[in-house]
């Protein structure tokens, strides 16, 4: 537990600076699931992300930020514990960190112990796959919502991924059906969890505005994690035939089998054919999945935009440090690989944006 992740160290340094200045800044930490730097601010010309692009004009943009491990639960442990997986031994699902480190102090707990109100909305710690939230970190109970969900009324049976994320079973429940990898219905933003998470964050900020205590508010969004269940209007922003398509769809030459991955998470969805790791998906399926990912990015950009705009409208932005962080990168068919769980650049490079109230212009760090 001796080695702090650089990101956690930055946040703790900000905390120490606030203490030294005798001014206690609030902290709004926004965590986004499976978000690689597919944003305009990071130079992605196809991505439609106007809210984050505009907001980042007065923020610090880290160009070379990486997750310590491209697995949801491990990456979040690394951030919230300030420790690497190589130090903790926490690499995968089903391992509650307090079973191994009962006296550990998490990042939000550090703030809580120093007089802050701490709260979590949405996906902060990974919940699912026999892994649970850490209630000790928060002043109030975690406000949890779904990661896997469908709005289609024809979807009535619980799917494998829904069961896993609901902590109903750890072994893959083969008796349950596979869900769709995407959904594009003409529905409101709040039909899906991220819209509801944004609204709860807005309500919570209204409550906190008159609070005498400073706050550490963690808000976690699920998209663009699979399934790409996103309102149709976000799909309509893109022409799938004009989105970036992987130019190399074969595994790196001489790469050992354990260094590459095609199946696993993505194979839990109905449209995905069973095949060997080296087999690329049909072009039409690849385009649909890439389309869904970009739609998910635009959807979550709007939800984050709602939260940031409300932070400003309440005046809380004048005394709040904002951190926006992706838990790891993502592969969209590049080198024949999908999702994450490998150590290639695309699976590990993340967006990291930090804004202090006194910042007047963007700073791009390549460190």
Put a short name on every predicted segment.
Residues 2-10:
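Sec-dependent signal peptide recognition
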Residues 3, 19-367:
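Formylglycine-dependent sulfatase
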Residues 10-20:
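Hydrophobic h-region of N-terminal signal peptides that target proteins for export
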């Amino acid at each position: 537990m001796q080695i702090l992740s650089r990101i956690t160290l930055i946040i703790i340094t900000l905390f120490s600076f606030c203490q030294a200045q005798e001014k206690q800044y609030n902290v709004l930490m926004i965590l986004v699931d499976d978000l690689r730097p597919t944003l305009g601010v990071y130079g992605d010309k196809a991505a439609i992300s106007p809210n984050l692009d505009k907001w980042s004009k007065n923020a610090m943009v880290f160009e070379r930020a990486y997750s310590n491990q491209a697995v949801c639960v491990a990456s979040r442990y690394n951030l919230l514990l300030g420790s690497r997986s190589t130090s903790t031994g926490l690499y995968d699902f089903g391992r509650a960190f307090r079973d191994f480190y009962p006296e550990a102090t998490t990042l939000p707990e550090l703030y809580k112990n120093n007089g802050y109100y701490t709260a979590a909305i949405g996906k902060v710690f990974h919940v699912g796959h026999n892994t649970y939230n850490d209630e000790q970190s928060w002043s109030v109970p975690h406000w949890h919502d779904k990661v896997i969900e469908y709005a289609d009324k024809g979807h009535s049976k619980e799917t494998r991924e829904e069961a896993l994320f609901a902590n109903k079973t750890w072994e893959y429940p083969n008796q349950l059906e596979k869900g769709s990898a995407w959904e594009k219905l003409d529905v409101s933003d709040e039909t899906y969890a991220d819209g509801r998470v944004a609204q709860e964050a807005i309500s919570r900020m209204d409550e906190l505005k008159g609070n005498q205590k400073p706050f550490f508010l963690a808000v976690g969004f699920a998209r663009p994690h699979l399934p790409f269940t996103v309102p149709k209007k976000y799909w309509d922003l893109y022409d799938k035939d004009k989105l970036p398509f992987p130019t190399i769809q074969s595994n790196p030459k001489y790469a050992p089998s354990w260094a590459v991955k095609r199946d696993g998470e993505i194979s839990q969805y109905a449209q995905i054919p069973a095949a060997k790791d080296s087999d690329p998906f049909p072009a039409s399926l690849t385009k649909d999945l890439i389309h869904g990912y970009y739609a998910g990015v635009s959807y979550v950009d709007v939800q984050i935009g709602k939260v940031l705009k409300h932070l400003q409208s309440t005046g809380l932005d004048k005394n709040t440090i904002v951190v926006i962080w992706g838990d790891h990168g993502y592969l969209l068919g590049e080198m024949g690989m999908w999702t994450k769980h490998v150590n290639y650049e695309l699976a590990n490079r993340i967006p990291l944006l930090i804004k202090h109230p006194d910042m007047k212009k963007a700073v791009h760090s390549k460190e």
